[in-house]
Amino acid sequence: LRCLVGSEMCIRDRVVLDLSNPEVQDFIFGIVDNLMTTYPEIDYIKWDANMSILNHGSQYLPSDQQSHMYIEYHEGFKKVCERIRAKYPDLTLQACASGGGRANYGVMPYFDEFWVSDNTDALQRIYMQWGTSYFFPAIAMASHISAAPNHQTFRVIPLKYRIDVAMSGRLGMEIQPKNM
């Protein structure tokens, strides 16, 4: 996406691709398709979208459609997801973006789970998952057992409690089993 007037904003040398553009949709699908063809043993992809849309304009959309940019972006994202899901139905996909920023009902048919937050501290996580469960089913929330001490809070929480909290969503691990 690009600013139509003024200078573009770039964070950590990243920009958001214009998914309203079918050529960009083909490009992104092609990357995933090439990856899956080259490495067919891949069975899990985390789709990380931790970049806010800062450049509010599309070079693809005509000027009278710029107010529809967010809608067209989302529709283009769904088209890419539909193609990936159709070609790779057994591939597990996780949507991840800044604490659930990609968690929306429009993309739930294409993703098996979404990442609620990078904060994996079980004591804090239980409140996040409880709140999220008001809107989304528990099975959609990726919930992982993490190491102790926690890498964000440095809190040491008993393994059983961390497992219990992680089991209230879609269970995963951010820890080597041998280190449990």
What residue ranges belong to the model's regions?
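Single conserved hydrophobic/aromatic residue that forms the stacking wall/gate
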Residues: 1-6, 10-11
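Solvent-exposed polar/charged
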Residues: 2-3, 37, 86
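Short acidic, glycine/serine/threonine-rich loops at helix termini
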Residues: 7, 56-60, 104-109
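The substrate-binding groove and active-site-proximal loops of carbohydrate-active enzymes
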Residues: 12-29, 62-76, 150
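An active-site-proximal structural segment forming one wall of the substrate-binding cleft
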Residues: 21-47
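Active-site-proximal substrate-binding groove within the catalytic cores of carbohydrate-active enzymes
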Residues: 40, 77-180
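Short, solvent-exposed turn/loop segments enriched in Gly/Ser/Thr/Pro and often Arg
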Residues: 47-54, 97-102
